[in-house]
Every structure is written in C-alpha cells, then in structure tokens.
Amino acid sequence: MLDAAAKLFVDPGYAATPLTAVAAEAGVAVQTVYAVFGNKRQLLSDLVDVTLVGDDEQVAMAERSFVADIRALTGLRAKLTRYARHLAETHARQVHVMLALAGAASADADAAAIWRKNLEDRRRGMAMFAADLAASGEVLVSQERAADVLWLAQDVRNYDWLVRERGWPVERFERWFVDSVAAVLGAPD
C-alpha cells in the first residue's frame, strides 16, 4: 500500500489521490487501507517515515547504524563525509515523495502539518549532529549556526537541483555537501 501511495502521491499528486485509488493501485479493498492507516494523513505520514529510513523498523534515527558510524569517526571532514553518503542514499530513495509532500503542503493542511513536522525533526537531528561535530574541536561557529547550516545543506531540494536537475554524479553532490558545510563550520562567526 505504501508503494501504491508513493506512486500516486507523486503523480497525480496527494490532493488528487483518494484512498480508493491507493487501494485499487495496491490491489486491496479500501477498507484495508483504512484499517491499516486510519486516514489519508496517516498514510502520508507513514510513507514519509518509511522513505526516510528505508524500512518500517521501529528504530529511532539516533540508534541507526549510520549514526554509530559517524560517532565513531574523528575529525570534521570524516564525519561529514560519512553523513554525506547516508544523505545521498536517503535522498535517492525519498526525493520524489518529499518533493510531492512539499508541493502538497502549499495547498493541503494535513500535508503542511507533515511537512512542518519533517522540517522540525530534521532541524532537531541537525542540532544533535552539530553537537557531535563540535566535539571535534574544528567547528568555529556556534552550535546553533552549525545546526542551521547542516539543516539547509541537507535539504532534499538541494539533491533534486544538483543531482536530478543539473545531472551531477552523486559523488560530486557528496563532495559539495562536505566542502560547503566544512567551509562554513570551519570559519569563525
């Protein structure tokens, strides 16, 4: 059902897709969609969560293996490089859904609430990452500014613009992320 929702929420779009269409695409009764998700908003929320992490495991983001990998590394660039690889993998998986969500947020209150929650969750995650990076001793800006820079740089729309629109190889996107963030974090406020 999530695959069907992902397909239809991207095209023709969230607002244009009734749950009956999701059910038909998934080959299930609409009652099944309601039984599993309750409503369209919850279906969208679950879809965003699953595309973000790549599975439906109930594991907090801070407990995911890539976070342990980053924490085990030393040095600003090493940590950013590992995060950039995770970021590119995540964006490749979620770009279509997240762009559809961003578009739907301008016209639909439920989508707007989910988009806002996603932005806030990402900002909290980047605040935790900024604190970890500060421990390297190489960050010369405030943790608040570091979190803001990380939050902006990791936005899915950057991946869309550079990789999908401009045709950058993923490796170049990863280098751009590391170089851009390291340059700002390593320069005094």
Language model region names:
Residues 15-16, 155, 166:
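Flexible coil/turn residues that form the inter-helical turn or adjacent wing/linker of helix-turn-helix
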Residues 4, 8-42, 46:
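Helix-turn-helix
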Residues 36, 90, 152-153:
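Conserved catalytic core of Hanks-type protein kinase domains
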Residues 85-102, 109-137, 144-148, 175, ...:
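Amphipathic alpha-helical packing segments from all-alpha helical-bundle domains
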Residues 103-108, 153-156:
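Short helix-capping/turn signature of helix-turn-helix
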Residues 4-12, 65-69, 97, 149, ...:
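Solvent-exposed, amphipathic alpha-helical segments
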Residues 40-42, 46, 57-92, 147:
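Hydrophobic alpha-helical connector segments
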